[in-house]
Amino acid sequence: MLLIDIASTSLNVGGTSSRLAKVARIAEPLRAAAPDPELVAIVVAWLSGELRQRQIGVGWATLRSPPAAAGSPALTVTGTDAAFSEIGAVSGKGSAARRRELITRLFAASTETEQAFLVRLLSGELRQGALAGIMVDAVARAAEVPATAVQRAAMLGGDLPTVAAACLAAGSSGAAGALDSFTLRVGRPIGPMLAQSAGSITDALERHGGATIFEAKLDGARVQIHRTGDEVTVYTRSLDDVTARLPEVVQATLALPVSDLVADGEAIALQPDGRPHRFQVTASRFGRSVNVAAAQAKQPLSVFFSDILHRDGRDLLDAPTTDRLAALDAVVPARHRVDRLTTADAAAATDFLRATLAAGHEGVMAKSPTAPYLAGRRGAGWLKVKPVHTLDLVVLAVEWGSGRRRGKLSNIPLGARDAATGEFVMLGKTFKSMTDAMLDWQTARFTELAVGGTDGYVVALRPEQVVEVAFDGVQASSRYPGGLALRFARVVRYRDDKGPADADTIDTVRALY
């Protein structure tokens, strides 16, 4: 299978807003790839906007100026995937130059359509509307099995490309059996359950219909912990094995009175007074090049267990939250458990939220006592409640959209005002929470503000439009000149009542950090 086949499919998928059409268009290359499990896994990953290698060390600076495109397509899917692996394996002195050389070679062999696809894939900007649910439906359609069976297998297998490869390789007669082979297995990570957002404590209580389990929401790193006998493995939220980097988590798990275990938890760096360090301090312990012994001595991590999915031969995924927490409390000491309160009283829950925030944490999780653990899914059984920060920032440029946003000026780079120079300092970009009406309005508005026309993918703007942006926090970032970036930024509204001189300053942002 050629790379152009997948690049063209991506274009076709992005060109329709119909869910059924997206599913049908993705199913076609999956059927064609079915005899080759490796090829299926690559196609599923790519059309989901992901690399199988996850990260290969290629950023925007490398992708910004690709070489002249090839005249005709010749690259294969497996050959391109192998090139990604080669690029990702480069390390040591001169590695940046070597990666640029390899990526330039790959792009020189790509047509314009293929180059556009590769840029979006490598930059994480492949927004064609093929979200996980659509990909599950496409795999189910290609394999002629129920989507619920694919979803369940992906939940337990922890990886949709692997599940799709096994399912499609088995053929129509063996696909169902292949899916049934994916069960909870200690040592094999599964997708973590995710939370929906609630607007307030009262909202969470109303949605859960009464008594709710409130837990402190720590601003650490999600970990999934597996133990079989004396062997412990630790995985990140994205299912990367980080066991060797987190000896504290391993030691705490080995101290538990269990033989085998699968648990959900949080690793976090705490200050001497028990308050959390900034998230970046915790995140620094997860780097691939970290000297673990030195890092542990400088900044040890603490681990807090919040859920248990398997214990000593008993699977607990389908058990209600109360049963899972009882199993957790029976083996995990209080010092390693997340603080929690079960109540139907809004005042008591609000006091718990305030105390949690005062302790330096993000907010609270509200969990339904009867909810099962929906691995890999964002269920209403878990709700997150946390304060929302907003800033008034200036739109510095805008990018043309894809998928349902095709033909609209969409993704906006955001800048805070530097009071000393009058310039604007970029803090990231977003298209989150933009309605269709907002996209229509800003396409017209930004066309008026465009500097040098609107033909390019990125359209430069006069820095005049102020936008109110909500975000979850500020983090350190080497990607932007100011050294800071907003976490999970989304648009609230455009502020036509404000000019660029009214925008928040970079000093205000630094104070939030």
UniProtKB/Swiss-Prot annotation:
The active site is at residue 217. ATP binds at residues 215, 222, 237, 266, 378, 384. CDD domains: Adenylation_DNA_ligase_Arch_LigB (cd07901), OBF_DNA_ligase_Arch_LigB (cd07972). One of its GO terms (molecular function) is DNA binding. PROSITE patterns: DNA_LIGASE_A1, DNA_LIGASE_A3. Its cofactor is Mg(2+). GO terms for biological process: cell division; DNA biosynthetic process; DNA recombination; DNA repair; DNA replication. It catalyses: ATP + (deoxyribonucleotide)n-3'-hydroxyl + 5'-phospho-(deoxyribonucleotide)m = (deoxyribonucleotide)n+m + AMP + diphosphate. Keywords: ATP-binding, Cell cycle, Cell division, DNA damage, DNA recombination, DNA repair, DNA replication, Ligase, Magnesium, Metal-binding, Nucleotide-binding. NCBIfam families: dnl1, PRK03180.1. Belongs to the ATP-dependent DNA ligase family. HAMAP family: DNA_ligase (MF_00407). DNA ligase that seals nicks in double-stranded DNA during DNA replication, DNA recombination and DNA repair. This is Probable DNA ligase. It comes from Mycobacterium ulcerans (strain Agy99).
